[in-house]
């Protein structure tokens, strides 16, 4: 299986003392580095994971997010089974050529996955470059 590593950026340079440093985790590990949290943010991950890994991420979020907490997922997503732009369609083709398990995820499938793990879809926010932030609550 692929292993992805993320290089922690210089969080200390942001001068946000009330914001904890990001945690490194592997969604395939059933033990996450925290037991419960109020907020989970993941950026540009769902399209580079296999679908089973996306399912594991949502299962982990469902186990870890406290009642009233929020899960925000940033990235390029298909809307209702369709690409939202030609550039997203081309990006999806590039990803799938590299690894057929990668690719843009459909928002309907992600919303259904959230429901399976006790998450209520709350909102979506358009972002630059045909990306969106999808927001769930526990």
Question: Where are the language model's segments positioned?
Answer:
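Class I SAM-dependent methyltransferase SAM/SAH-binding core
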Residues: 1-31
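A short acidic, Gly/Pro-enriched loop at the edge of an enzyme's catalytic core
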Residues: 32-40
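A short beta-strand submotif of the Rossmann-like class I SAM-dependent methyltransferase core
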Residues: 39-46, 51-54
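A short glycine-rich, Lys/Arg-flanked "PGG" loop and its adjoining helix->strand segment in the class I
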Residues: 55-70
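Acceptor-substrate binding/catalytic loop of class I
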Residues: 86-87, 93-106, 126-127
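Core SAM-dependent methyltransferase catalytic element
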Residues: 117-138
